[in-house]
């Protein structure tokens, strides 16, 4: 059995970190650099950084910002936001990203994912899919609903060569009430590439449910790390204690999560 991954998600407006609920009611929550440094000390398996305003503001990714963050990131670093071309993806990788996350452009320019895979390999390409009502793919930070069914789109992205899928429930985002397990399960059953559960994590048990009942390979979370005392390290400890194989990064005296 492959080891599961625990990964914080950092959302940015291009300069500062922000967080909302249901892709709305955004508020500033701090410095990207401080967060990257903090999470690097907290036993994360991977870090996801998304500039959620870049596409709507028709900006390219902030390569200078990513370059600075990558200097302080010593775990796999997945970066997205504003990726519209192979050159955007190349710029992020040159700036220090290990993986490129593509969202709206995967829907609006379907050949892009295959082109990125051809240039950089599947292991570098993550397709982020935001889902409303458990079935409809949305783009532009949830503002625009498409007619694409999420399961069929997930299969299309796998066929295009995507290395993994980041699945976020718009309604669950920021609520800390738990992941959309049926949504995650439907996609995990339809594809053979890793599925990252996102949107709604509020407890370590929510993560266990996404892995056990949803079939996810990894769990992403944001609000529960920013607004509670819960940490990725304790999440991994909890999951380990409940039978999941994790990358162990704690000392013998680390507390057990409850």
Predicted regions and their residues:
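Conserved, mostly hydrophobic/aromatic
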Residues: 11, 39, 47, 79, ...
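Conserved anion-binding
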Residues: 12-19, 23, 98-173
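Glycine-rich, proline-tolerant flexible connector loops at the mouths of alpha/beta enzymes
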Residues: 46-65, 104, 109, 166-178
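C-terminal helical cap(s) of enzyme catalytic domains, especially alpha/beta-barrels
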Residues: 112-120, 209-221, 225-250
């Amino acid at each position: 059995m492959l080891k599961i991954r625990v990964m914080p998600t950092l959302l940015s407006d291009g300069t500062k970190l922000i967080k909302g609920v249901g892709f709305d009611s955004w508020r500033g929550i701090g410095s990207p650099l401080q967060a990257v440094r903090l999470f690097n000390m907290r036993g994360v398996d991977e870090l996801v950084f998304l500039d959620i305003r870049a596409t709507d503001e028709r900006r390219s990714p902030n390569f200078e910002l990513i370059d600075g963050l990558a200097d302080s990131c010593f775990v796999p670093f997945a970066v997205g936001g504003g990726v519209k071309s192979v050159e955007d993806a190349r710029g992020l990788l040159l700036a220090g990203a290990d993986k490129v996350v593509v969202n709206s452009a995967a829907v609006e320019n379907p050949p892009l994912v295959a082109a990125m895979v051809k240039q950089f390999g599947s292991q570098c390409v993550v397709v982020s899919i935001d889902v409303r009502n458990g079935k409809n793919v949305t783009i532009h930070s949830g503002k625009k609903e498409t007619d694409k069914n999420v399961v069929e789109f997930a299969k299309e992205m796998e066929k295009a060569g995507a290395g993994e899928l980041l699945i976020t429930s718009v309604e669950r985002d920021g609520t800390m009430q738990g992941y959309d397990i049926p949504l995650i399960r439907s996609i995990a059953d339809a594809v053979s590439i890793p599925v990252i559960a996102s949107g709604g994590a509020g407890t370590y048990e929510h993560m266990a449910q996404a892995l056990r009942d949803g079939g996810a390979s990894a769990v992403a979370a944001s609000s529960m790390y920013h607004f509670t005392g819960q940490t990725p390290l304790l999440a991994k400890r909890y999951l380990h204690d409940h039978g999941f194989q994790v990358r162990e990064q704690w000392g013998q005296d680390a507390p057990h999560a409850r």
